[in-house]
Regions:
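Generic detector of solvent-exposed, compositionally biased contiguous segments
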Residues: 70-94, 158-186
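Surface-exposed beta-strand/loop patches in noncatalytic accessory domains
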Residues: 122-178
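A glycine-rich phosphate-binding loop feature that marks nucleotide/adenosyl-phosphate handling sites
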Residues: 30-36, 48-55
Length: 199
């Protein structure tokens, strides 16, 4: 239960904070913790998939040392910034050559977004006034962007321009959520450009 889990998670957060030189934000600490989370093998059975989000959330966090040191087959980048209204942060990079075979990009992608949105209690159920989302994918030859990730637990992302009902945007895109996780395992490869973006 939460009375047992909460102190363990708080201890891990405190250990991460202590192990990092200098000061980092609360959002960065939470992002590091959540980014490390994994789903135990017990819960990977097919019968759990439809309820996994409500039963285990983003999963169980690793210990502080594993969170900060990672492993030799992965890299984690942390972007910590204050995003002003109607602005965005964009980062371009080339897909690692060691993960390109026969013109296709391979690898596992995981993105964790943690924000502290403005809250206005005058709006009651709609008190959260900002929605921040992530797009990650290929930069096409015409300079357009092709998104290649979807929110965790979703098989097909819904665009903000699809004119969906508010509840659908909340369910499918995790709209208004201050914590969002996106993930994709590229086992069969993605053809096309090897220049990618994070936005």
């Amino acid at each position: 239960g939460t009375s047992f889990a909460a102190p363990l998670v708080a201890k891990t957060l405190a250990t991460i904070d202590n192990m990092i030189d200098g000061n980092v934000s609360r959002e960065t600490l939470l992002a590091l913790l959540i980014h490390s989370c994994y789903v135990p093998s017990t819960f990977k059975a097919k019968e759990y998939q439809s309820i996994l989000k409500d039963v285990i959330g983003y999963g169980l966090p690793k210990d502080a040392s594993q969170i900060l040191n990672g492993d030799s087959h992965s890299i984690s980048l942390v972007f910590a910034n204050r995003i002003m209204p109607k602005k965005h942060l964009e980062f371009h990079f080339s897909w690692p050559k060691c993960l390109i075979r026969n013109g296709k990009c391979y690898g596992n992608i995981k993105i964790t977004l943690v924000s502290t949105p403005q809250i206005n209690w005058n709006y009651k159920d709609e008190m959260i006034r900002e929605n921040i989302s992530v797009s990650f994918g290929q930069i096409m030859p015409d300079n357009s962007h092709k998104n290649q990730v979807t929110p965790l637990y979703k098989t097909q992302v819904k665009k903000e321009t699809d004119h969906l009902y508010e509840w659908q945007l909340i369910e499918e895109n995790m709209k208004w959520s201050p914590i969002k996780v996106y993930e994709r395992n590229i086992h069969t490869g993605i053809s096309g450009p090897t220049n990618w973006y994070l936005d």
